[in-house]
Design a protein with these regions (language model features):
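Metal/cofactor-centered catalytic core regions of large enzymes
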Residues: 2-597
Length: 597
């Protein structure tokens, strides 16, 4: 018996053929997606399932709060460091620690470095091949490719000979029958719209980005000792600075700082002359995707804000990336967000594999409970081999966070919309320029294509802020200010018996919050609400669907057994790690396997 109902402007109907993609990708765990399609191959129902239990909140109970960052940092290895940053913010907020100006600046440098790196890796390595047809690049004319590239930017690696060499490398790869990571792509799918020359240019830049991303993270190794999972410290940053070439071994000196400047300059060059033109090229060939994948982006979006310009000040006046919330599509009214208000952020579990004393009620993270309860209910298959989920019951290891009762989209698109409608001049100029170049209305940014464009915009914005913060650091150092940590309250004896704190920032994928309660010098409660929790949210007691689920609604699939459209939209939210994806029929039999990038 089919179920049909109205929610958030969509008609959800689980009749029709069921298509299962499992796993989609690994984002802080594994993800499964099931959709129903009608006779016209239009998605009428979408079900997003997180299939791995994380449990770090339980692991942290009873531990030293000063160690929390090192545990939670392991939640994700791609957006590395951002959970550690939210954690030290939370512990410092609880204990009442004020960090030095240099510590705040270096933390912003670390976060900006992560954003630049993550946006480049996402655009090319994780989502690029959803738009670039690798095999079609073999049909390109290298001379025409060179003309195309040189018409878009002054990037020096754009000669006919360069593209001929790249094409020849690809041809040898294909002729050898060893496609490797490209083996299971849907090459030739009718949704691939780029010309052969644009495909060759995109593939060449894919290889360049794969090499260049190793350079960007050297900034993390200079200030944080390593990457992934650089080092942090409650009270500041654990990096000594010594400009006279003497003193402690490993201290940051002018040679290291000059290297940082060199990397920032090269990163800006790559983003401005490669990534942004490539994003616009994809947009020129795929304008139809400015009307696909809207989901919640025209209704409900959320950003906490990030990059405090003033140390220890997390007000909207201090945050260079503004925060706010929009509900019901009222973008003229961007509302303030208070992470301590129990009426604003609540997590629900009535469709997740967790238990509350009353599953019908949401709980603020300070009152959060992480009590896993795997109970898939009436499903096709068995509890250990689910062939088809039952979204009327519990179906995910991800809770359902809501802001004032609304499902929200977070991430670059949400941040861009918030900043734009709060009147941020740089955002307005950048977005208007992009949409004008593509001859698309502003509403076109609320789409799958828009999420791609917003990452390019953010990368350009962020590398400018990376230079800004580095210049401020150098000014402080030249003025003799070398302090990077405040250890006055390092010893637990100086802490209150009971205290609570909130740490928030913006990960590349969206709003990130950590809530910590400390009692008798140990962690009593710790809760993380991460970007994927918002976007991959299951249904709630009102049957509201999450951002992933909403973005897939109404999408028409050209070839259901080759679900490129599903991957494009879900990847536009920024998946993390590569994994093997299997497309299943409604009887659980495998139809085809692809490599999710």
């Amino acid at each position: 018996m089919s179920n049909q109902y109205q929610t958030q402007g969509y008609t959800v109907n689980d009749a029709g053929r069921r298509l299962i993609v499992d796993p989609i990708t690994r984002i802080e765990g594994h993800m499964r997606c099931e959709v129903n399609i009608d006779e016209q191959n239009v998605i009428t129902n979408a079900v997003s399932c997180g299939t791995m239990f994380r449990g770090l909140e339980i692991i942290l109970q009873g531990r030293d709060p000063r160690d929390a960052w090192a545990f939670v940092e392991r939640i994700c290895g791609v957006c590395t460091g951002v959970h550690a940053l939210a954690s030290v913010y939370a512990i410092e907020d609880a204990i009442g620690i004020q960090v030095p100006d240099n510590a705040n600046i270096i933390r912003n440098i670390m976060l900006a470095t992560l954003w630049c790196h993550d946006h480049l890796v996402h655009f090319y390595q994780l989502a690029g091949m959803d738009w670039i047809d690798v095999l079609n690049a073999l049909k390109a004319d290298p001379r025409a490719t060179s003309q195309l590239a040189q018409s878009l930017s002054a990037w020096p690696m754009s000669s006919p000979g360069y593209f001929f060499d790249v094409q020849n490398r690809l041809k040898k790869f294909v002729d050898g029958g060893q496609l490797g990571i490209f083996r299971n792509g849907y090459w030739g799918h009718p949704q691939y719209k780029l010309s052969p020359e644009a495909n060759l240019m995109g593939f060449a830049h894919y290889l360049e980005a794969l090499d260049f991303q190793r350079e960007i993270v050297k900034i993390h190794t200079i200030f944080g000792g390593k990457n992934p999972h650089p080092n942090w410290i409650v009270g500041g940053m654990p990096c000594a600075i010594n400009l006279d070439q003497s003193g402690a071994v490993g201290a940051i000196n002018m040679e290291r700082l000059n290297l940082v400047q060199s990397i920032i300059t090269r990163t800006a060059d790559f983003i401005n002359n490669v990534m942004v033109p490539d994003a616009l090229a994809i947009g020129q060939f795929n304008k139809a995707w400015s009307q696909i994948g809207t989901g919640l982006s025209d209704k409900c979006v959320l950003s906490y804000g990030a990059f405090p310009d003033i140390a220890n000040d997390f007000s909207q006046q201090s945050l260079l990336m503004p925060g706010g919330a929009v509900i019901n599509g009222d973008f003229k009214n961007v509302m303030p967000v208070d992470l301590a208000d129990p009426q604003q952020i609540q997590e629900f579990v009535d469709h997740a594999w967790y238990r509350y004393p009353d599953d019908r009620l949401g709980r603020h993270p300070f009152d959060g409970i992480t009590d896993p309860w795997y109970n898939p209910g009436d499903v096709k298959g068995s509890d250990t081999h689910i062939q088809q989920l039952n979204e009327q019951e519990r179906y995910s290891w991800i809770k359902a966070p809501r802001w004032r009762g609304h499902a929200m989209e977070v991430g670059p698109l949400a941040r861009t919309l918030i900043a734009y409608h709060k009147g941020d001049a740089a955002t307005i100029e950048s977005v208007d320029r992009m949409m004008s170049a593509l001859k698309l209305p502003l509403s076109g940014i609320q789409s799958t294509l828009g999420r791609i464009l917003c990452r390019a915009h953010e990368a350009q914005w962020t590398v400018g802020k990376l230079q800004y913060f580095f210049d401020r650091l150098m000014t402080n150092l030249k003025n003799g200010d070398l302090a990077t940590a405040n250890t006055e309250k390092w010893e637990p004896a100086s802490w209150p018996q009971h205290c609570r704190g909130i740490g928030f920032t913006e990960a590349p994928r969206g709003a990130l919050g950590h809530w910590a309660s400390i009692r008798d010098q140990k962690i009593e409660l710790y809760q993380c609400v991460v970007p994927t929790t918002w976007n991959a949210s299951p249904r709630d007691p009102k049957k509201q669907i999450g951002a992933y689920e909403a973005a897939l609604m109404g999408t028409q699939m050209a070839i259901p057994d080759q679900p490129l459209e599903i991957l494009r939209t879900l990847h536009s939210f920024d998946p993390c790690l590569a994994c093997s994806t299997h497309v299943l029929g409604d009887d659980g039999s495998e139809l085809i396997a692809v490599q999710v990038r």
